[in-house]
């Protein structure tokens, strides 16, 4: 699946309607947000998506607009918008 689609699926089904693996949901997202493993995967994902840096997550917020779970995970990840 395209990397951008995977990134948009953090913590829940993607806004595009694609479902992501239960394994990632169990290991990457805890009850209070992204777990340590999930944070590393998110960092790797952001780095790959942005061409080498993880300085901005604006694109994922745009893609996941209206998605409370994704927003909560990003807050846990350390960015507040």
UniProtKB/Swiss-Prot annotation:
Keywords from the named record: Cytoplasm, Disulfide bond
GO CC, alphabetical: cytoplasm
Tissue: Expressed in placenta, heart, lung, liver, pancreas, skeletal muscle and brain.
Transmembrane segments: none
Cysteine-cysteine disulfides: 7-73, 8-29, 11-45
Keyword Cytoplasm among record annotations: yes
UniProt subcellular location: Cytoplasm
Keyword Nuclease: no
Protein name: Putative chemokine-related protein B42
Organism: Homo sapiens (Human)
């Amino acid at each position: 699946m395209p990397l951008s689609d995977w990134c948009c699926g953090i913590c829940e089904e993607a806004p595009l309607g694609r479902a992501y693996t239960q394994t990632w949901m169990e290991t990457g997202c805890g009850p209070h947000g992204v777990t340590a493993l999930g944070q590393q995967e998110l960092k790797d994902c952001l780095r790959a998506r942005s061409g080498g840096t993880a300085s901005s997550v604006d694109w994922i917020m745009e893609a996941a607009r209206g998605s409370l779970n994704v927003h909560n995970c990003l807050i846990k990840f350390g960015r507040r918008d």
